[in-house]
Amino acid sequence: MAKEITIKELTEAELIDWFYKASGTKQYVDFYVSELRKQQQPMLEINCGTGEILRRLNAEGVSCDGMDCAAEQIKICGDEISRLEYDSTLYCVDYNNFTLPKLYKTIFIPQSMLCMITDVEMATKFLTNVYNLLENGGTLLFDIYIPWKDITDYHSNKWSSGDAIENPETGEIFVYSYCCDLDLSQQIKTTNSKYELYKDGKLVSVHFDSSQSRWYNDNEMKIILENIGFSSVSFSKILKTSDLDYSTLFTATKLI
């Protein structure tokens, strides 16, 4: 009798950890690590997740702490930090209102995390709290993603064909599919996602979620940063993933 396979739902933290280890995000991590080598320590990674970038920096001897709002992801990150005997402090905070016991020379926010804050007033408050964590002369780096491919080829609630990623170490195959709805006037994208994990040709894990994101135009974000008090705001296109899709890297300095 064939063994029955139980399909379990992946937690968000397990999903992110698996995806980072198996997908082509190495290019993204490499980019950030390369940029951060030019910056001063100590550093803080906001939205550190399970710690892919943080661990790379620690391995190079960079003094870097991590912060996230997801306790489960902080736990996975902390377990790895402890196992590798790295010296990083991790903070689990409420993104709506946070402060930390120290200041930093460099703060970076990867994964276009700011796009997940769909209210401009809340995004401004978040960035103000970040500003207050920087030393005078400190630098903020973060990236913003605008979904140009979805905007130019928009089909409401049409599911994309699944993108498959294979983990060469385990042979597991990860399939990601999504459909989206766009509010162009408010710059809001609502995404319904399905993540499937296959092993030996059989579905073994699945995760569904729905999320909203807001894209910020370059000059719009520049004005937000300058109104908070940042100076020397600059931005450049980075990490092109297709003819249309790319992220924009922002850098800004706190000068009092």
Residue ranges and their predicted role:
Residues 212-256:
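C-terminal lobe and adjacent flexible extensions of AdoMet/dcAdoMet transferase-like proteins
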Residues 99-107:
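A short acidic, Gly/Pro-enriched loop at the edge of an enzyme's catalytic core
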Residues 142-219:
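SAM-dependent methyltransferase
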Residues 54-97:
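Class I SAM-dependent methyltransferase SAM/SAH-binding core
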Residues 47-49:
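Class I SAM-dependent methyltransferase "Motif I" SAM/SAH-binding loop
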